């Protein structure tokens, strides 16, 4: 018999799943359609496609874990699912980092030679970082996969549960998040500095004039700031979710922490949609037509 609290958590998890599924699905369809329409790879569309695609998969992984964990707590494939989860989560972070670098490249205006050099090579550097990430994490995945088949045989007087050391290796995989998070913070900091210097120039030279560049700065910072907040919640909730799954597992705690984690891929998709005028207008039209159709067919 489910408790009222657990039933409420399940309802919240389903709502978050539907929001993330629709939001990220809309972004994937839009970015792919833009690529088909223009017949050329736009950096922005490619980043949004990768980011939304990773979030779409991440949303499914969270709901699968919540659905299957109570039934198959000791299943070996669930452990592989947790490793794949870490890889997709890190890929999502890398694409969010590329988005912050893209904003920084398009919006900021600095005259320092080092910045100009990085600005010219930002796209190629990003591709090399992504390639290096996949190679390193592929090697780590193979290593951890071998560990699953050959658990460590240490001193018989000191034995750790299989689940505990498995999650320890999942934490090792998660260490790949440090580099993209640092790059994200640096590029976001450069956006803040650029906004501050631009604001000072505008106060001196063009007071009262509509400032399009400042608006672009603020829109980008809102998106990146919300991402950082949601990602920090995701990171802080992850260890508690893992701890809740160790023996004896606490199902209510698992739902609490993974519901908090699910807010990251679902809510940020809405923030991205609000920052893309064409997608926002399309979603508003669809929502308005849905409401009108419901009124026409309603009682």
From Swiss-Prot:
Any one of the GO BP annotations: detection of chemical stimulus involved in sensory perception of bitter taste
**Origin: domain of life:** Eukaryota
Membrane topology type = Multi-pass membrane protein
Which keywords does the record carry?
A: G-protein coupled receptor, Glycoprotein, Membrane, Receptor, Sensory transduction, Taste, Transducer, Transmembrane, Transmembrane helix
Which residues of this chain are annotated as glycosylation sites?
155
**A molecular function GO annotation:** G protein-coupled receptor activity
Residue intervals on the Extracellular side: 1, 67-82, 149-175, 245-253
Membrane-crossing segments per the record: 2-22, 46-66, 83-103, 128-148, 176-196, 224-244, 254-274
Q: Which residues lie on this side of the membrane: Cytoplasmic?
A: 23-45, 104-127, 197-223, 275-299
One Pfam entry for this protein is TAS2R
Can you quote a single GO CC term? plasma membrane
Query: Any idea where this protein resides?
Result: Membrane
Q: What else is known?
A: Most taste cells may be activated by a limited number of bitter compounds; individual taste cells can discriminate among bitter stimuli.
Function of this protein?
Receptor that may play a role in the perception of bitterness and is gustducin-linked. May play a role in sensing the chemical composition of the gastrointestinal content. The activity of this receptor may stimulate alpha gustducin, mediate PLC-beta-2 activation and lead to the gating of TRPM5.
The record's comment on protein family reads: Belongs to the G-protein coupled receptor T2R family.
Q: What's the protein called, per UniProt? A: Taste receptor type 2 member 5
* Gene that this sequence comes from: TAS2R5
């Amino acid at each position: 018999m489910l408790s009222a609290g657990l039933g409420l958590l399940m309802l919240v998890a389903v709502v978050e799943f539907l929001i993330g599924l629709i939001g990220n699905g809309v972004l994937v369809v839009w970015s792919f359609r833009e690529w088909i329409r223009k017949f050329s790879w736009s950096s922005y569309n490619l980043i949004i496609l990768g980011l939304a695609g990773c979030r779409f998969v991440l949303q499914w992984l969270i709901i699968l874990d919540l659905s299957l964990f109570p039934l198959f707590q000791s299943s070996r494939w669930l452990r592989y699912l947790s490793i794949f989860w870490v890889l997709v989560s890190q890929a999502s972070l890398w694409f969010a980092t590329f988005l912050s670098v893209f904003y920084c490249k398009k919006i900021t205006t600095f005259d320092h030679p080092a910045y100009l050099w990085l600005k010219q090579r930002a796209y190629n550097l990003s591709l090399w970082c992504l390639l290096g990430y996949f190679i390193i994490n592929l090697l780590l995945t193979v290593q951890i996969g071998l560990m699953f088949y050959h658990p460590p045989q240490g001193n018989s007087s000191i034995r750790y549960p299989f689940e505990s050391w498995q999650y320890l290796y999942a934490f090792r995989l998660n260490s790949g998040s440090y580099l993209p998070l640092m790059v994200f913070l640096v590029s976001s900091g450069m956006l803040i500095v650029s906004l501050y210097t631009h604001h000072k120039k505008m106060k001196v030279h063009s007071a009262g004039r509509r400032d399009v560049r400042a608006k672009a700065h603020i829109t980008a910072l809102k998106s990146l700031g919300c991402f950082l907040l949601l990602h920090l919640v995701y990171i802080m909730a992850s260890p508690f979710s893992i701890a809740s799954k160790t023996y004896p597992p606490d199902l209510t705690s698992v739902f609490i922490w993974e519901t908090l984690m699910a807010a990251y891929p679902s809510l940020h998709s809405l923030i991205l949609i609000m920052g893309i005028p064409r997608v926002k207008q399309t979603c508003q039209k669809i929502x308005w037509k849905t409401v009108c159709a419901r009124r026409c067919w309603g009682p």
